[in-house]
Amino acid sequence: MQLAERHIIKSTEHRFTQIDELAFKSKNLYNAANYVIRQSFVYGSGYINYNEMNRLMKSHQAYKVLPAKVSQQILMILDKNWKSFFEAVKAYKVDSSKFTGRPKQPQYKDKVKGRNILVYTIQAISSKQLKKGIIAFFKKVRYEFWPGKLDNTGFMYTSSIWEPLYQAFGY
C-alpha cells in the first residue's frame, strides 16, 4: 500500500517565499533545458536524452542554484515529457481518431507566473535529520513526518498554496 502525507503552506507563512523562489528557479531550469531540446529537435540534430542534457546543463546557472539531485529530477521530468510526446505522436500516426488533434511538444512554463515542481529524492535529504523523523529541505524549511519507508518528497503548487508531498511505502 502507498501512503502520502500532505502539509499545506499558505502564502502568509515565511516558508512560502523560500519554496516559491526555488520553484521559480526550477521553472528556469525546465525552460532552459526545454529550449535546448526544442532547438536540437527542430533543426534536425535529433532528440537530446536525459544523460546528455544533464551533462550540458551542469554548467548552466539555473542548474547550479538548485541542489544537484533536485536539478537532475527536473531534467528527468522533462525527459519523461518528451518521451511521452514521441509516444503520443506514434500513437497518433497509427490511429488519429483517438486524439482531438496532433500532439504538441512540451511547452515552456510562463516566464513570470510559472513555477515548477520540486522533487527531493531520499538522497537529497539530510540522513541525520531523516532518522529523527524530520525532513530538512533547506534552511528554515523542516517538516516532521510520519515514520515509515520514505520514497520521494516534493513541493507542488496549487492556487497560492505549496503542498509538501511525502510518499511512504510499506504501511
Show the residue positions of the predicted features.
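Nucleic-acid substrate recognition interfaces
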Residues: 1-171
